[in-house]
């Protein structure tokens, strides 16, 4: 049996009525002020849909609803919340988040549908964790560094699993890390297994809100477990004996407190920074050693590749800029172009 097709006017009225019902339902779903106590300050420990775990000043964690007027709430946000009155009927959670304080920083990741998606707030340090196994990738480190420079959050490079190096291997890795030390980045060499180098890392984390970034298999979770202590063990799967790669088991961003002071937000959203949403000029600015040479190329539209009179390429040839970094710069630009091409094709594919 065929069905009568709605006219455009009828369809508009159906859609309008549907939106009106949604709005009415949302308004009814909000909460009576009389059910909650006096406002208090707190910090979001984790976010789960329309609920958030909020830590109060006394260190207690409260599962809270979120006012529908709050458009964005992520781990690390400092908030005003109100505790639920225990005697009141209909209060199934411990409180409600009323407002969010202005953020000092926000870590985002690109999203194919929404542009960028916030995943953590108020961080002041990104710890880039790499390791000699399964592979020491300077390209991945450089991608993270571009992300840090774009977000204007201070990076700290941590090389894990140094207990697996012999003297010759240690010399080689130190030469690689000198590339970053020479342009002003902090580098720490550690082992979560033997705990070598953990003391300087603890000192670098004290008094800061950090987030650890690293690919699977670099020992990020094991390193966090060693720093946090057994009372705050983060789930970890063994590295596969076949692939040498680890399984990332964190499912939601969560804030933890270090025993020595400082906080860390562990999030699955920062295993690898997506950079495809950035413009090529932002990638160029993300390489700090390029800054002194920008604006000195022969041509204003210089691509810093085979262009004649390129000041950056000349600096590479003179040894002022590491050739590895220059090559990774172009690899990043190439990968961005490929992803944007796939995205544009997907957007136009009906």
Swiss-Prot record:
It is found in: Cytoplasm. InterPro entries: G_CP_dom, NA-bd_OB-fold, P-loop_NTPase, Ribosome_biogen_GTPase_RsgA, RsgA_GTPase_dom. Residues 104-273 form the CP-type G domain. GTP binds at residues 160-163, 214-222. Transmembrane segments: none annotated. Zn(2+) binds at residues 297, 302, 304, 310. Pfam families: RsgA_GTPase. The keyword Metal-binding applies. One of its GO terms (molecular function) is metal ion binding. It comes from the Bacteria. Its cofactor is Zn(2+). Its EC number is 3.6.1.-. One of its GO terms (biological process) is ribosomal small subunit biogenesis. One of its GO terms (cellular component) is cytoplasm. Monomer. Associates with 30S ribosomal subunit, binds 16S rRNA. NCBIfam families: PRK12288.1, ribosome small subunit-dependent GTPase A. PANTHER family: SMALL RIBOSOMAL SUBUNIT BIOGENESIS GTPASE RSGA, SMALL RIBOSOMAL SUBUNIT BIOGENESIS GTPASE RSGA 1, MITOCHONDRIAL-RELATED. Belongs to the TRAFAC class YlqF/YawG GTPase family. RsgA subfamily. This is Small ribosomal subunit biogenesis GTPase RsgA.
